Amino acid sequence: MKIEEAIRYFERELEKIEEAEAIEASAAEPDEELLHAWSYEREATGMALTALRVIHARLVCLGIDG
């Protein structure tokens, strides 16, 4: 898998996580443990996405096709 593909994958996953988190938060009685879990998942996915973007930028600077 190329880095660009991995970035797109994690972008889609982050959108899904944010949507699920928003749906749970808007529930009549949101499950706080589930919201906490979604928060961790969102943060971890965001960190992975940031790392991939940094790696991609470095490869581009080096003239390497990621």
Q: Positions of the model-derived regions?
A:
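Absolute protein N-terminus
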Residues: 1-2
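Short, charge-rich amphipathic interface segments used for partner binding and complex assembly
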Residues: 8-12, 19-65
